[in-house]
């Protein structure tokens, strides 16, 4: 038990931290500041919690987000009062929308120093609007036993709300009066002799429980799956147990004889041996309108969020098939506003129901074969064309690295073009690669810091990013000496925002280049020298493959591929519609 009895603030903060330790907290990220001194002392001196200081609050919050993604447990972030807390906001929004548990602790001035220009003071109560799962301002520190019990139970509730019913951020605003440094106060010192050793005795990590399906749910499923042609759409997913997740979807697919349209940002493509009905080229298949019309299903089983593909979404909207959306969270995953039913169960539960209730698989095998034959043809066309490309071309990067990275590598895929090329070209494999991403709100904020959080205490991690996403978060490089593990950054340097070249605005020059593509003209070799990082410029595909397998075990390095965003965009426009030529 690590309770500091020197002052009101040290007692209060150390009880808060000790409570979190008993609940399972392993890591706290702290940005420097004086108002948060009691919290900093409590975390930094706790022997069982890894506490990492990070200068920039925005970077700190995204680093914590990355660790939480990887560990599937809440991570604490701490900052001082004022605009420091505002810099947490982008990561809190992403945590909410991507359902990642974060516990946000913002130190604050006491009530008498607010709204009077006391300095470094803003209104921090409900600072993050509706984005936290729950938020509270704690009372001022006290050593009264009832107040300490209130603190303990409030922290327990806040921790639980980071995970249930849907993971997300929780905000504690914590006011402190002076003295902030651990200066002795008699009333705090006196507490030590009468403080109960059993104060934390009942605390245990909170266990997730599965809902028990009822007869109404089983009847609904039986009615939906009566001899209908159907598909499974497996969208964006960062499951805690990816192999179990993939096995469950494979069981559903083979029980119903439904093909599985698997997003590139799903682990399914990296466990392809589990699923003989895996469809990775759905976006390209659906570009053939005649075939797309034949492939319209009666029923769609949507697992979690929809894939990124606009082609798929447009086809689904026009088809207006009934969709069953499978996800335990309370989020609405129907941006198409179609005929949908949300079932708040896990995919593992659904697989168990289908198997134990003896659902038949007498669905249209010809429909299934049509999908599988199209997949085989398009995959062959992609592989043939890519194998002949010798120059550095952006779309080939995703195709190549999916066949090159070592087994069990974690990869963080940045937003904009990388996520789309992964969806188009990531080859199904058996490498058990786990993709990570920030697709809650699809921004480029915190790209590097999130990837570093995923890499922390893990040796094999890769980030695929464009130049603008990396430049937007270069403060993340300040973490280089805090990282325990390795991150290889595959940098696609196309001198600007390549995704805008795919949009109609690209035809309007000016102002397209200056205000949309926004080339930054940065020498990344010089940038790496500033931070003491390894940098290599890639000139051939063979060189890239050799540098990606095996991966180093420590440090950060950048492998830079210089591409032409206009030529890459033209290649996509010329080729994406042709792979389905039958």
Curated annotation (Swiss-Prot):
Homodimer. Keywords: Magnesium, Manganese, Metal-binding, Thiamine pyrophosphate, Transferase. SUPFAM superfamilies: Thiamin diphosphate-binding fold (THDP-binding). GO terms for molecular function: 2-succinyl-5-enolpyruvyl-6-hydroxy-3-cyclohexene-1-carboxylic-acid synthase activity; magnesium ion binding; manganese ion binding; thiamine pyrophosphate binding. Its EC number is 2.2.1.9. It catalyses: isochorismate + 2-oxoglutarate + H(+) = 5-enolpyruvoyl-6-hydroxy-2-succinyl-cyclohex-3-ene-1-carboxylate + CO2. GO terms for biological process: menaquinone biosynthetic process; phylloquinone biosynthetic process. The keyword 4Fe-4S does not apply. HAMAP family: MenD. Pathway: Quinol/quinone metabolism; 1,4-dihydroxy-2-naphthoate biosynthesis; 1,4-dihydroxy-2-naphthoate from chorismate: step 2/7; Cofactor biosynthesis; phylloquinone biosynthesis. Binds 1 thiamine pyrophosphate per subunit. Its cofactor is Mg(2+); Mn(2+); thiamine diphosphate. Belongs to the TPP enzyme family. MenD subfamily. This is 2-succinyl-5-enolpyruvyl-6-hydroxy-3-cyclohexene-1-carboxylate synthase. The gene is menD. The keyword Metal-binding applies. Catalyzes the thiamine diphosphate-dependent decarboxylation of 2-oxoglutarate and the subsequent addition of the resulting succinic semialdehyde-thiamine pyrophosphate anion to isochorismate to yield 2-succinyl-5-enolpyruvyl-6-hydroxy-3-cyclohexene-1-carboxylate (SEPHCHC). It comes from the Bacteria. InterPro entries: MenaQ_synth_MenD (IPR004433), MenD_middle (IPR032264), THDP-binding (IPR029061), Thiamin_PyroP_enz_TPP-bd_dom (IPR012001), TPP_enzyme_TPP-bd (IPR011766).
């Amino acid at each position: 038990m690590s309770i500091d009895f020197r002052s009101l603030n040290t007692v209060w903060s150390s009880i808060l931290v000790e409570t979190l330790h008993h609940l399972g907290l392993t890591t706290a990220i702290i940005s420097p500041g004086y108002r948060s001194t009691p919290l900093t002392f409590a975390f930094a001196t706790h022997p069982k919690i890894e506490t990492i200081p990070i200068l920039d609050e925005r970077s700190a919050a995204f680093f914590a987000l990355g660790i939480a993604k990887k560990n599937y447990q809440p991570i604490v972030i701490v900052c001082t009062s004022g605009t420091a807390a505002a810099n947490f906001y982008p990561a809190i929004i992403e945590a909410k929308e991507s359902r990642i548990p974060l516990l946000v602790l913002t130190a604050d001035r006491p009530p008498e120093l607010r709204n009077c220009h006391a300095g470094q003071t803003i209104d921090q109560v409900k600072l993050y609007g509706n984005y936290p799962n729950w938020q509270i301002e704690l009372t001022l520190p006290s050593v009264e036993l009832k107040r300490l019990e209130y603190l303990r139970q409030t922290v327990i509730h806040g921790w639980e709300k980071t995970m249930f019913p849907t993971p997300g951020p929780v905000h504690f605003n914590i006011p402190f009066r002076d003295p902030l440094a651990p200066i002795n106060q008699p009333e705090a010192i006196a507490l030590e002799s009468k403080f109960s050793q059993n104060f934390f005795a009942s605390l245990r990590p909170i266990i997730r429980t599965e809902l028990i399906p009822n007869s109404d749910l089983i009847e609904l499923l039986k009615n939906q799956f009566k001899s209908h042609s159907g598909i499974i759409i497996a969208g964006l997913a960062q499951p805690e147990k990816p192999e179990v997740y993939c096995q469950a979807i494979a069981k559903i697919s083979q029980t119903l004889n439904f093909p599985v349209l698997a997003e590139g940002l799903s682990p399914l493509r990296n466990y392809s041996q589990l699923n003989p009905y895996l469809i990775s080229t759905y976006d390209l298949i659906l570009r053939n309108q005649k075939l797309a019309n034949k492939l319209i299903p009666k029923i769609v089983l949507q697992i979690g969020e929809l894939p990124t593909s606009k082609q798929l979404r447009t086809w689904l909207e026009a088809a207006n098939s009934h969709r069953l959306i499978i996800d335990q969270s309370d989020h609405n995953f129907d941006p198409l506003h179609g005929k949908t039913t949300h079932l708040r169960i896990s995919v593992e539960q659904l697989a168990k129901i289908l198997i134990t209730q003896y659902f038949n698989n007498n669905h249209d095998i010809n429909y299934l074969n049509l999908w599988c034959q199209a997949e085989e043809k398009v995959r062959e066309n992609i592989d043939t064309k890519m194998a002949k490309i010798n120059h550095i071309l952006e779309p080939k990067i995703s195709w190549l690295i999916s066949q090159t990275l070592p087994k069990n590598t974690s990869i963080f895929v940045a937003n904009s073009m990388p996520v789309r090329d992964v969806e188009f070209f990531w080859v199904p494999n058996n490498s058990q690669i786990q993709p990570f991403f920030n697709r809650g709100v699809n921004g480029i904020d915190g790209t590097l810091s999130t990837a570093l959080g995923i890499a922390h205490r893990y040796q094999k991690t890769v980030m695929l990013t464009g130049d603008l996403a990396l430049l937007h978060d270069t403060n993340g490089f300040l973490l280089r000496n805090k990282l325990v593990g390795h991150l290889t950054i595959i940098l696609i340097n196309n001198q600007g925002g390549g995704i805008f070249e795919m949009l109609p605005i690209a035809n309007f020059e000016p102002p397209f280049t200056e205000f949309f593509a926004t080339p930054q003209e940065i020498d990344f070799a010089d940038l790496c020298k500033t931070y003491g990082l390894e940098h290599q410029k890639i000139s051939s595909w063979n060189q890239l493959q050799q540098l990606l397998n095996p991966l180093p075990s420590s440090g950060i390095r950048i492998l830079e591929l210089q591409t032409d965003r206009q030529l890459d965009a033209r290649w996509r426009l010329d080729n994406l519609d042709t792979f389905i030529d039958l």
